[in-house]
Structures are given as C-alpha cells and as structure tokens.
C-alpha cells in the first residue's frame, strides 16, 4: 500500500472532476435535492462504519469500503443496486483488499441482521433482507464498476508523516484523524488526493484547538486553494449536521430514494 500514489489507478482514474460528478448524479437529483442526497450518503457511511466496528475491522478497512461505496454511486444511480446491499458488499471486498483476513459470509450476514435490528431500527422496520448469494452477486458488479481499481490511498498515512514534521501533538493528531473519518461523509475522497485531504483536516483541527501553525502551512508545497475547498466541504458537513435529525428524517428520505425495480416473480 505504500506504493506511488501518482502512478496509481486512484490518481489516474479515480480523482474525479466536480462537474462530472454532478452530471452523473442528475438522474437521482431529479428525485432528491442535493442536501437530501448527501444525507442519504451520510446515513449509509454510518452503516458501513457501524458494521466495520462490529466486525472489529481497522479504520483503514472501513474507510476503503466507504470509498468503494462512493465510487460506485459516482458512476451509477441509486436505483442500480440497493445501498443496503452494496454497503456490506463493500466491507467484504475492502477486508480482502486491505488484507485484513477473510470475513466469513455467515458472520457478515449475521452482523448485518444484528446491526440493522439493534442500531438502525429507526430506519428499517423489516429485518436485513439479503443473503450470501446476493452479496456475492453484488461483489461481481462492484468489481466491474470499479474497473478492478481496488487500491485506495487514504489520508491517514500522509497525516502521520505531517505530524512527524510538526512534532508530538497527540491532541492535534487525534482530532485530525477524527476529521478525516468525518470527511468520508463528503465527496472529498472522490475529488482530491489524500495528502491534500490530510492537510485540509489538519488545518481545521488547528483552528479548533487554536494551534498557531500558519508559518508551517505556508512552507508546504501544496495547492492551498484545493486545501481550502476541502476544509470548506467539511465545515459545510458540520453545518448540515447541526440541523439534521437522522432518526426523524431518514425514513422519509429512504422512501423518496430511487430504488431498483424488483425482479419479476417466477
């Protein structure tokens, strides 16, 4: 995973243009507002996070699964595959790619059933409807849509390198790490290289903790306009969170969301 980002498929194929991203979403944005669309993706990122934690996965594995999820819908409408099926499929694939070890299919399904029942019953009245065969079929479509570009570079490694330069700042590291996790609920992982995301999150953390590192930031060889765009996207996420009660709103959003056509009954 420590290979060259600039020569990777992540850089060459999966740093997308914002206008292309908006254009690809037009079908879904006929039904949903941009804010509703983002709220749905925040919700499914939460599902991936909780599933990953229940399965005791590293944050890197959870983050990669979330990026797979976002990449799929960057090229496809929500009606192509139910996000509730794609979320655990992304976890399964990510755990293989990140060499975490194989999650047994039965354990994955059982965890999905438990998590939906115990943690997300405010969104789903029914139990988790999918079985192993659905997830394996979905994995095939996911691989196809990702063009088998499975190596995802995350901002965590560049953050650790930046922190070595700054010096021992445990509080700053912890907060920036959390902000990187939060950034997965925005589009920044689709639009910017991971080192820029790390710097954008570090900048916000410095403001929150009132750390004076302006001269250090000024010496970085980085496009600060891009860094500001990333910081703005994360601040906008916090603004959205303030007025958003997921437990009250999500059922109506899921009802409104474009859905796959059911298979004809045989």
Swiss-Prot record:
Keyword Nucleus attributed: yes
Function: Component of the Mediator complex, a coactivator involved in regulated gene transcription of nearly all RNA polymerase II-dependent genes. Mediator functions as a bridge to convey information from gene-specific regulatory proteins to the basal RNA polymerase II transcription machinery. Mediator is recruited to promoters by direct interactions with regulatory proteins and serves as a scaffold for the assembly of a functional preinitiation complex with RNA polymerase II and the general transcription factors.
GO cellular component, one term: mediator complex
Location in or out of the cell: Nucleus
UniProt cross-references to SMART domains, sorted A to Z: CYCLIN
Domain Cyclin N-terminal: 47-151
Domain of life assignment: Eukaryota
GO molecular function: cyclin-dependent protein serine/threonine kinase regulator activity
Classification via CDD domains: CYCLIN_CCNC_rpt1 (cd20513), CYCLIN_CCNC_rpt2 (cd20514)
Name the record gives this protein: Cyclin-C
Keywords, ordered alphabetically: Activator, Cyclin, Nucleus, Repressor, Transcription, Transcription regulation
Pfam families listed in its UniProt record: Cyclin_C_2, Cyclin_N
Species, as recorded: Anopheles gambiae
Quaternary structure and partners: Component of the Cdk8 module of the Mediator complex.
GO biological process entries: positive regulation of transcription by RNA polymerase II
Protein family: Belongs to the cyclin family. Cyclin C subfamily.
Major location category of this protein: nucleus
């Amino acid at each position: 995973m420590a290979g060259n980002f600039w020569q990777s498929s992540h850089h060459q194929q999966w740093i997308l243009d914002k206008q292309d991203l908006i254009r690809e979403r037009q079908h879904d944005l006929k039904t949903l507002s941009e804010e509703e669309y983002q709220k749905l993706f925040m919700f499914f990122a939460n599902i991936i996070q909780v599933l990953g934690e229940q399965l005791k996965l590293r944050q890197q594995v959870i983050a990669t699964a979330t990026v797979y999820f976002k990449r799929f819908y960057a090229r496809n409408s929500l009606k192509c595959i139910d996000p509730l099926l794609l979320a655990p499929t992304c976890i399964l694939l990510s755990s293989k790619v990140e060499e975490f070890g194989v999650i047994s299919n039965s354990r994955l399904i059982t965890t999905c059933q438990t998590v939906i029942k115990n943690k997300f019953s405010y969104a789903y009245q029914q139990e988790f409807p999918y079985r192993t065969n659905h997830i394996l079929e979905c994995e095939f479509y996911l691989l196809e849509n990702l063009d088998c570009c499975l190596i995802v570079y995350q901002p965590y490694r560049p953050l650790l390198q930046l922190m070595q330069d700054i010096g021992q700042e445990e509080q700053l590291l912890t907060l920036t790490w959390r902000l990187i996790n939060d950034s997965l609920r925005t589009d920044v992982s689709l639009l910017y290289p991971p080192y820029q995301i790390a710097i954008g999150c570090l900048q916000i953390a410095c403001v929150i903790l009132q750390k004076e590192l302006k001269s250090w930031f000024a010496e970085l060889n980085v496009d600060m306009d891009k860094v500001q765009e990333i910081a703005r996207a994360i601040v906008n996420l916090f603004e959205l969170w303030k007025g958003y009660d997921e437990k009250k709103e999500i059922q109506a959003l899921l009802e409104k969301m474009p859905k796959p056509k059911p298979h004809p009954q045989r």
